[in-house]
Amino acid sequence: MPLTRYQSRNEYGLADPDLYQAADKDDPEALLEGVAMAGLVGILRQLGDLAEFAAEMFHDLHEEVMATASRSHGLMARVQQLEAEFPSIEKALLCQTDHSPFFSNKGVEWHPNLQLEQSVVTSGDLPRCVMDSYEECRGPPRLFLLDKFDISGAGACLKRYTDPSFVRLETSSYEESWDDIQREKKSQKAKRRASQWRNGGTPENALSSHAKLHELFLEEHLEAHHSDPARVVKLKTRKLDGCSLISKSGESYMEKFVQTRVDSKISYEIITQNPGLLTWNMDSARDVVTDIPEISMVGAMDKSHGGSRAEVSFPSEQENVANVNMNGGFIEKDIETVPESTYNEVRGTTITQDSQTVLNGKPGFFQQRSYSEDLTSEADNYVDAPATMESETETDDECRPKSRSDTLKDGNHHIYSDAVEERMEDPPQFSFSHSNGNTPVSENGRSSFGKKSTSYSYSDTASISIDDQSDGEKLSGCLPSTSSFKSELVDSMSHVTPEANKVSHDLNVQESVSSSNVDGQTSLSSNGTCSSPRPVSQNDQSCSLTVQSLASEVVETSPELVRLDLMKGGNDGRKVDPFDSSKSCASFDAKNSDLPSETSSISSTSEGSRCDSTIEKNCMVASNLVNSGTSPQAFVDSQTGKQLPIADTDFETNSIVACSEVLANSGSDPEERDGRCLTGKLVPCSAGVGMEVSPDTPSKVCGPSSADGIHLKDTLDDETDCVSVTNVVVDVDSKNSVADVGSQSSVADIDSQSSVAEISDEHSCAFGNTADVSVSESHEDTLENGMSVPSDFNSGVEKLAGDASPTCSKCDDHISHEGFHDLSGLDNATTDIVPNVELDVSDNDNDTSSGGVNHAVSLSSTRGKGSLPWISTNTYQSSSDAGEIFHDTVVESDGTLLEDNNPESEIKMHKSPLEVSSEGLSTEPDNKDVESIESTSPKPSLDQRNRDTETKSPGESILDDNCIDSTQVYNLNLLESEAIDQAVREQTSYASHEVADEELLQSNVFRGLEFEPQSAGLEFAPQSAGIELNRPKQELNLDPTFPSFGFIPETIPPNPEDMPPLPPMQWLIGKVPHSFPTFMGESVETSSSALSAAPPIGSSLNVQIGSPPSELSVSLGSDESERLPGGFVHNASEKPLQSSIQFPTMSTDLNSQYDSSELPTIPYQECIEDFGSEENNLLADHAAQNHELVYSQASSLQLPQVKHEDFKDDADVHESQSSSDDHHCPETKSLTPTQSTKVEDKGHSVPDASNAETAESSNTSVQKINPVSVGDAMWPVSCFSVAPTLDTYKTEVVPTVRLPRPRSPLVDAVAAHDRRKMKKVSEMVHPPIKSKQDDKDSLLAQIRNKSVNLKPAVTTRPSIQTGPRTDLRVAAILEKANTIRMAMAGSDEDEDSDSWSDS
């Protein structure tokens, strides 16, 4: 009841508080009256609520009573009805004599036709709750509307679609049909057995009981495996020439049928990871088998390590049996369907395919080959997948020729394409591309090559495709196998650990097995990494997939990693575990471990002339193999199957490439870190071999290179992956220019791996082949540039090979251990070489390759120091690479290179970019550089970019060391002028290059200038060279920035090792180092050239680019400008080069350059701080030494110098940042160049009017660079301001930024960035903002006026309401209270009033 709830409350609390609150508290009477009134009102309210509640309750009770009464009346009526009806029912029941119907009838039939309602007691058929749901539901489908269209008339449709009898009828008919089928099947089989016996059965061996037993087994088998008769295929019986139950071997049928294992005589060719059904297309309709499940040998690969030759014996299909090797080895595999076939061993052909092998372009399927000898077709034997196994076994035993068993016995799978059979057609259709045991990844765990026999299932029809009945020569497309066998492990190379094999997994398994390459090349069906989705062998030429002789089917594994099963590898009988995993090409090496990396080289060189894609791939593979192999290498003639000895020197480059490729293969599979191990093994040979690619060899490679590029492209959709790996190896393994063929952006991606990634874009560079091809292209480019690339390259590379071979080997091993993607893990020098100096490592090869691609620069920058100068002349990238390489080498070598001061090298550099580069390659620094690289390589902590920078550093530092000791300024000037000239020449030559002209120009200018400045920078900064080694390119940039090393040494920044790495300035600035990745491989090299040329810095490089060589030199002005570019250009060049590539047409606007410089200037506060102290001194000294003549350019250069000095102090941090952003310290360098550019632009445009245009044009390039540099540049604002102070007073403002240098570089960078943007935006936006502001102000004023007008009313109203309302209410209440009191008082009014008043 409500009262209970309200009792706890004050009675008057229920009433309006105004009733008593208004009373005067000082007047007790008034207060009491108010409280009394409130209490009464509350009580009345409670009573009213209670009355309402009671009314509702009684109403509900009334309704319930009425409902109960109604139901009771209904019950009474029903009871009465029952009483009336029951007697009749009772009578009927009692009258029945047989009560059995009660137990059998369905319920109402026994009633005497008396229909009663279901619910006798309740009124409805269903409970109300259920009826409600029915009422709410929709009605039945209005099928009656269709009755007019039905012949049966009204209600037919509803009945037809709701009658369950229809379903029952269908089921019964189905069962009947099933029974009929079973009966027919049994009778047919019995007849067939009898006919076979009649046709020549030998009763002594095969008894009638055997036939009966077989029939029973078969029936049970079918019943067990086929519950659905509709799926059972009825086969037509045909008479065979021999006893069906007795095979020629003399064993009874039951013997074989009961055996769980089959003798070596019986083997099954195909195993698919996908146990999908194979449809055989046979000419004869009677032979057609609709569905034939293939035998799945998926497990074999994994367990194949142990066996000799693994052959799958065929037990009954229903049981998954460990296949017994023909040789006694066993492979545990599930045999889902075992089409029996003989293997025709084709020596030297690797038909092997991993689970990834795809037939007819269909992954996971191997075409099955029917017996080609006595068995015209096994199709008749297949009733079903399960039935097929059994019947096939039976027929195999019965009809299988001895020769088939014999072929299997020898342990080699031989597929006989005997024409004896009528059904020759069928075998081709079913020809298998490989047998697991024979696959390079053999089921035994040994490559088929190791077995000496390549089981190449060769049938008259080479077509792998099931449907394709054409000749085997035809690859029905690359049959990429989606599934990958674990047999890759089987393919484990002797050099590769099982893990590596596993790692190589599908990609490696993908190795394309071409039995005989059309070119007779190494069966390098696929590159180490054929990551492209399409199989390498899509084009017969493109891959060795096309098997010339027995290559009826070259089963290519998925493009991930087509592995080359050397046709010859098997023929030698060597147990070569193809580097199925980490190196597809490695498989060749693994196979011929004795074949050094040169094998691939041989393929490319010897076979290269063929220019077949196979060659390219073979070359690539050979490279991988070569890497795995020892220095001596042999080329395997695919056709002859003989190994061709090849000079180590000839294949040094190739072997390195191969090594690189092997690394690429191992690295190409990102998952395949184990490949590192493989690669490491492969690499050693390359260490011995300096990846020396003679011009001839490169030319050969180049010849096939074009074809290779195409084929590789086809072959490698994911070339980048493969290429990347190759590049890494190439760079590391040798001064291989392989990587450069690809686009620069590839290099950026692959930079961590190596420039080789670029090959992927170019596609001309396959893996190992890519290296060769790239080298070839590089040589051509070098020649184009007028360089003696071949001789220099060969000699330089050889020297490098000799000098740096330990480093290469180290790098290669490191790479192999690290995995392709772990290039960062590689020795810093090597790694640096690989990503940025990949071509650099390649020495001249790389440079040569650079012609083909901007990354030729990377190729150019060789690990060998001597190579570097040589490279610089090869192409724009060559010279730049040379400088860059030296620069990087300096960075990488760090102290080591600095220790190696070779004036000769510097002089060479000064001589001319071409001369210097060629000489430099062969200069003393090679050994030291190698050492430096090796010593530097221990700096894997640096980003790959850093490593690249470091790698380049060593080369660069060679120059630095040499140049620093020798005339610093003079050499710098010489180098600058020569580099400028070369840059101009390179610009011209590269303008026509496929690479963007501007991009090339920038890189050329960078390279040329960089080369000069490199020597200059080297000259000035022995210390900075050391610093640079520590922080790749940054220190060197600082040194070149400063006029002379003498002054710079004071401000030598601590070694990067000593300094904590700073985050990339780009990060601080918030810019993405987009250009870095692309140019890491090239850009770093470019950076080295950038260092030598001042393009990134601004007008120096710009002038060089835009101006003739002489003008460029003038614009550079003095050694300072030269050095400054050397230091700055390296960083700027990396980024600017990328930038230039990215922004081919950049306005040479001084403002934009200024902005770019300014932005980079802001990034490093530390630089600013150091800059403040050292910058002024250094700049002053620098300005003093470097002539005021070039003060505009020089000052801009000086500015970066000062920044560099700051960076020297902050170099390590800066280097880390730049290395993280770039692969090297490009950020630092970029920053340096950027600021330099900024200052230079201003100074250059002001002081060098003659070079203004040139500077402008170069600024255009530089700006292209600058966007990157800006993002990457980490120059502190103070640094930038210093430069303006020296060069021009435009940047006087920067000192202000320097003041806040305590702030983080990020803040400065943001401030500078914002400031620059604000300037632009402020000019454009201010007027509109003002107008908008005015509009807003006017609107606001109007609104305010309106609101002010409205406010008074609002305020007045509330004030008025409060007082009077209360008074009125109180008065009214009092009046009412008085009235009530008066009424209650009645006759006692007077007394009451007295009492009230008294109280």
From Swiss-Prot:
InterPro entries in alphabetical order: SCAR/WAVE_fam, WH2_dom
Primary residence: cytoplasm
Tissue and organ distribution: Expressed in expanding cotyledons, expanding leaves and expanding siliques containing developing embryos. Lower expression, sometimes not detected, in unopened flower buds and in matures leaves.
Key words, A-Z: Actin-binding, Cytoplasm, Cytoskeleton
Record carries keyword Cytoplasm: yes
UniProt biased composition (Low complexity): 597-608
Stretches for region Disordered: 178-205, 371-456, 502-542, 568-611, 896-961, 1102-1139, 1207-1261
Compartments reported by the entry: Cytoplasm, Cytoskeleton
GO terms classed as biological process: actin cytoskeleton organization; actin nucleation; cell-cell adhesion; positive regulation of actin nucleation; trichome branching; trichome morphogenesis
Stretches with biased composition (Basic and acidic residues): 398-426, 568-580, 942-953, 1207-1227
WH2 domain mapped to chain residues: 1335-1353
Domain of life: Eukaryota
Signal peptide range: none
Bias (Polar residues): 430-456, 507-542, 1102-1118, 1251-1261
GO annotations of cellular component type: cytoplasm; cytoskeleton; SCAR complex
Keyword Cytoplasm assigned: yes
Single annotated GO MF: actin binding
This protein's domain notes: Activates the Arp2/3 complex and binds actin through the C-terminal VCA (verprolin homology/cofilin homology/acidic) domain consisting of a WH2 domain followed by an Arp2/3-binding acidic motif (A), separated by a conserved linker region (C). Binds BRK1 through the N-terminal Scar homology domain (SHD).
Similarity remark: Belongs to the SCAR/WAVE family.
Protein function: Involved in regulation of actin and microtubule organization. Part of a WAVE complex that activates the Arp2/3 complex. Regulates trichome branch positioning and expansion.
SUBUNIT field: Binds BRK1, actin, ABIL1 and ARPC3 (Arp2/3 complex). Interacts with SPK1, ABI1, ABI2 and ABI4.
Protein name, entry field: Protein SCAR2
Organism encoding this protein: Arabidopsis thaliana
Gene transcribed to yield this protein: SCAR2
